[in-house]
């Protein structure tokens, strides 16, 4: 019984891995666009409107303006 359970779980993992790889091949543009959006984010320059310190290049957001 234990051997059958191990074989069943192994088969489930292989099926899940194969379907994940297939979906990545079907939609490579989605993967690239999400990767590019992460790379294209920039910090805000001095004088630009901000919400928090981490969005400013200087890490200083006072009264919603980067310094």
Curated annotation (Swiss-Prot):
Record comment regarding domains: The presence of a 'disulfide through disulfide knot' structurally defines this protein as a knottin. The cysteine framework is VI/VII (C-C-CC-C-C).
UniProt keywords, alphabetically: Cleavage on pair of basic residues, Disulfide bond, Knottin, Secreted, Signal, Toxin
Protein name: Conotoxin AbVIM
Main location: secreted
Propeptide residues, chain positions: 18-40
InterPro entries hit by this protein: Conotoxin
Tissue: Expressed by the venom duct.
Cystine residue pairs: 43-57, 50-61, 56-66
Family note: Belongs to the conotoxin O1 superfamily.
GO CC entries: extracellular region
Domain of life of the native organism: Eukaryota
Signal sequence annotation: 1-17
Subcellular compartments: Secreted
Gene Ontology MF annotations: ion channel inhibitor activity; toxin activity
